Amino acid sequence: MKKKVLAAFLMAAMTISMVGCSKPADTKTSETKSASKTSASATSTASSTASASKTSSVANTEQAVEKTVVAAMPGKWSDLYPMGEDSHYDNIIFDQVYDSLVKLNGDGSYQGEIAESWEVNKESTELTFKLRSGIKWHNGDEFSANDIVESFKIYSNPDIKTTSRYYLRYLDGCDEGGVETKKGSIGVTAKGDNEVVFKFKKPTFVDTVLDDLSHVYIVEGTKLKDKSAEELGKAETWAKPNGTGAFIYDSMVDGERVEFKANKEYYNGAPDFDKLVIRVVDSANILAGLMNGEIDTVLYGGVPLDDFKLAKEQENLVTESVKSQGYQLLIFNCAKKYMSEKVRQALSMAIDRKSLVEQLLQGEGEPIITPISSINPYYNPDVKVWYDVNQAKKQLEEAKFPFDKTLKFYVPTGNSMREKAAAIIAENLKAVGVKTEIVQVDFPAFMEAAKKGDEDLGIVGSGGSLNPSESSEMLTGAFNLCKIEENNKLIKLLKKGDSLLTMEERKPVFDEFQVEMKKISPYGYLFTTNSLVAYNKRLSGVKPENFSTFNWEIHTWKVSE
């Protein structure tokens, strides 16, 4: 039986390798394809790329073989605009080229990236970063503290298109959305060439600010500050990304792969290998690629659950299941007239989360009812996961739910686990009389539909956070996909918790937040998913425990051929 399964995967890989390449396209205007077609083409294209890279034919026998790492992700990135990331797929691309001040580890601690160290003042109103030395931009320009200052001025400019402005909301001189209150008012100043000071509006828990700053990519602000908002919004401005990161952008085939060269002058230690290729590979094809060596690891989404047992049996792979904050959630479009609080509660309690975890995840996860899971120090054990079909039916009837209506249920393609979860949820809802039509689109199209409010329901994943206040990102601003009223009770509780400076003060407030989150149900939180990590044994120095916080540190990996 095992041989048949192995043969099936190898046949899949061979079939994929025979598919032709698609042409490169403009990063902003190319037509998106279905994830399965994209990944099949990507597998073919990058198969030859990886093979050629790993076996680099050389005319001179003394020339060293080029070392290449090929990493996969199951979804397509949006574009190369680092201030407007829409998904973790975008983050995977940007994270190679650009750096942030700090990075979050899986255990909740922070490590410096551009920052060598940091210190908060006694009043917790200022945070001073000392910067590392030897930092250079990929174009050879010297890096300075002023690049950070100008980067944050760009992010806070209301005319600039950015989804990262939200992370500036605690800074002095910015409003609640992170917008500067007047031109250049943001409280970020350089102290010489090697220090930057961040001033807060009021005393703030320092980990909250560090968490936000870990999401902000530093761009070459001193060069970009004089460009207009229109220029900064053009794809050609970012066609050749210039960062300080461990990898230098080389080329891409839109929707299929991005290739990078190692930054041999990287201030945090040059990569051990020469080239990094990030490929879009449908989750159904990931194990085949790992088994035959076409891909070395998966950066987001991990190995599909159905394939993990077989992955663990492969002699060429290292595997690990790691608990994570990452979760899946159901989007309820609160802007729809029928989608009242009572209806949202009913739809949420109609979902059998325990069965989803046991049957779909084979126990590699945990049912949740809020974004705060049991491994989070802020977890409230008194807020129980619900499942009550009879009560769900009763509440729908009491709310006069339009049972004759078919709800559009948007599902992004490329993640087989999520697609299967959506099908099961549709059956759960059918059991309480709710009709759905599943609409499958690629991830960028899904995000566009969700932001416009085209959907009735949607399913999406989040990396989660140990910091409860990050939940506000999905309740206000660009990522308020549920379209809930902005000034809601949940936001008020999060702000209250944020205003407190000790764990002892904050915990009761975030306990109440979880109670209210279940009651208001703007989203139907479903389950956490363990990170099912697999990587080729030729790699060492990989830290699976940090994958859930998107801190891959690829430049620290070692490669043996």
Each predicted region: which residue ranges?
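N-terminal lobe/hinge region of extracytoplasmic solute-binding protein
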Residues: 72-122, 153, 242
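Aromatic- and charge-enriched surface segment that lines or borders ligand/interaction sites
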Residues: 116-164
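Surface-exposed binding/hinge segments that line
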Residues: 166-224
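Gly/Pro-rich hinge or "lid" segments in bacterial periplasmic/extracellular proteins
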Residues: 199-200, 204, 212-271, 275
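Ligand-site clamp/hinge motif
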Residues: 235, 263-308
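Ligand/substrate-recognition segments at binding pockets and active sites
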Residues: 254, 399-464, 503, 531
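Append "and occasionally in soluble cytosolic enzymes with long acidic Gly/Pro-rich linkers
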Residues: 339-427, 432, 512
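Detector for C-terminal structural segments
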Residues: 350-378, 417-424, 449-561
